[in-house]
């Protein structure tokens, strides 16, 4: 039990103590990313780049499921943290219970609707006749397993807010290891192809989900399942507060389609494969920012719920120092190590390899600015101001990105696709800095 991670005063704040939240949260984000990246590596090595492109084509549907889960998970867990900080554990448990129920039900309904018109939807996403069967084989497991996919993500966030970030990390670690082992068995040994990749991912998610159920049944700290006093209004409040993450996932879904179609126009199916590789690798980089921000958000939420604004200000200073240094190190590493990262997915000297390396170095310029944008959005969500958080995320992940994806390739062709993200992040930074200049909201 890690209840001591609630800071009662500024004097209690120590970096070592704070890292007990931040490090497990980042590692959780990292191993969640493993579900996707390991599939990509095995599929690329054993099946081929066309199968890799198929995964990228259908991934917008996965983003929709994650968007539903994250809207309730981030929004609901932020509200639960405020309740816990304010010594209102019963209200926190109600928020947890209604968020979990609503997310799973909505996720299942949306998946059923997608399955009803799946071939048409896949065509709209850009699945060619060459990719169609692989697209279907991969996405079926995600859609039929929607309650598990959504529930696993919900548990990840609420276990952390319940004061057990290490257990939250262990659920992700266990699922990630399970995923890797079964990828090797299904794809490498049994030659099940892209179906094996999807099945391995589902089994990893299932293990994490079961561990979440066991946690809340056996030894929760603050939160517990309850069906007393639940309301649709509370579910709506949780969803609205987590709007930024739903917007982010929906934006990823839409912009991935635009990325793929633009790459297909300028570089054919090799271009789509290069986009896939860059998307996989950027998850690792963005995960650092997201993991740090979400790790800090829980003690921030506790302090804000307790109206301990001096603690909030000190915690925010840690974030500003981190985001002054980390982006420079991250982009430098991305530029230098791009060939090594891409080598996991494509053969050196191939068209896809060269395209992905040069593209990642341009795309990675966005890492210099995205960190503070992500923190600004999560900070506002933590303080219960989901609409401001949603505005920041809408700008960086959708409106500005879509604008630059349409405009820049007209002048810079393929390089314009890679530079769309840095351009969107730079303009969003103006809004993010404006929100950060405002004092902690009382």
Residues covered by each model-derived region:
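Transmembrane helical elements of multi-pass membrane transporters/channels
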Residues: 20-39, 141, 175, 204-208, ...
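Interfacial/gating helices of multi-pass transporter permease domains
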Residues: 43-63, 129-134, 194-195, 234-241, ...
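Short runs within selected transmembrane alpha-helices of multi-pass transporters and secretion channels
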Residues: 73, 142-160, 168-176, 197-210, ...
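Helix-terminus/linker motif at the lipid-water interface of multi-pass membrane proteins
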Residues: 34-53, 122-129, 185-192, 253-284, ...
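Hydrophobic transmembrane alpha-helices of multi-pass small-molecule transporters
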Residues: 64-67, 179-183, 208-213, 283-287, ...
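N-terminal transmembrane alpha-helices
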Residues: 9-47, 60-75, 79, 104-111, ...
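Short alpha-helical transmembrane segments in multi-pass integral membrane proteins
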Residues: 1-22, 80-147, 189-243, 300-366, ...
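Small-residue-rich hydrophobic transmembrane alpha-helices
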Residues: 52-112, 149-168, 274-338, 370-389
């Amino acid at each position: 039990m890690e209840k001591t991670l609630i800071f009662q005063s500024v004097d209690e704040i120590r970096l070592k103590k704070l890292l007990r939240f931040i490090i497990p949260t980042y590692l959780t984000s990292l191993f969640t990313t493993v579900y996707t990246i390991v599939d990509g590596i095995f599929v690329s090595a054993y099946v081929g780049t066309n199968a890799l492109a198929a995964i990228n084509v259908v991934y917008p549907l996965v983003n929709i499921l994650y968007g539903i889960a994250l809207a309730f998970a981030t929004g609901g867990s932020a509200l639960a943290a405020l309740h816990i900080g304010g010594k209102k554990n019963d209200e926190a448990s109600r928020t947890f219970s209604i968020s979990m129920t609503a997310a799973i039900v909505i996720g299942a309904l949306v998946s059923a609707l997608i399955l009803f018109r799946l071939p048409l939807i896949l065509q709209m996403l850009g699945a060619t006749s060459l990719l169609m069967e692989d697209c279907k084989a991969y996405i079926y497991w995600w859609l039929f397993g929607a309650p598990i996919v959504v529930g696993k993500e919900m548990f990840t966030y609420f276990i952390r807010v319940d004061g057990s970030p290490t257990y939250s990390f262990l659920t992700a670690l266990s699922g990630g290891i399970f995923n890797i082992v079964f990828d090797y068995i299904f794809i490498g040994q049994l030659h099940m192809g892209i179906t094996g990749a999807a099945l391995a991912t589902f089994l990893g998610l299932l293990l994490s989900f079961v561990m979440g159920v066991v946690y809340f049944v056996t030894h929760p700290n603050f939160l517990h399942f309850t069906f007393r006093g639940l309301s649709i209004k509370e579910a709506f409040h949780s969803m609205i507060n987590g709007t930024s993450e739903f917007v982010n996932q929906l934006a990823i879904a839409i912009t991935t389609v635009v990325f793929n179609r633009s790459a297909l126009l300028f570089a054919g199916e090799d271009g789509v494969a290069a986009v896939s590789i860059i998307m996989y690798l950027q998850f690792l980089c963005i995960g650092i920012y997201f993991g740090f921000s979400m790790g800090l958000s829980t003690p921030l939420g506790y302090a804000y719920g307790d109206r301990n604004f001096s603690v909030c200000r000190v915690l925010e200073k840690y974030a500003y120092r981190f985001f002054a240094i980390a982006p420079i190190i991250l982009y430098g590493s991305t530029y230098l190590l791009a060939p090594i990262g891409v080598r996991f997915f494509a053969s050196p000297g191939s068209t896809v390899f060269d395209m992905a390396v040069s593209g990642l170095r341009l795309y990675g310029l966005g890492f210099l600015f995205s960190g503070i944008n992500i923190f600004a959005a999560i900070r506002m969500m933590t303080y219960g101001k989901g609409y401001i958080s949603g505005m920041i995320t809408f700008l960086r992940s959708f409106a500005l990105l879509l604008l630059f994806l349409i405009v820049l390739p007209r002048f810079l062709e393929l390089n314009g696709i890679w530079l769309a993200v840095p351009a969107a992040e730079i303009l969003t930074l103006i809004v993010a800095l404006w929100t950060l200049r405002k004092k902690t909201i009382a």
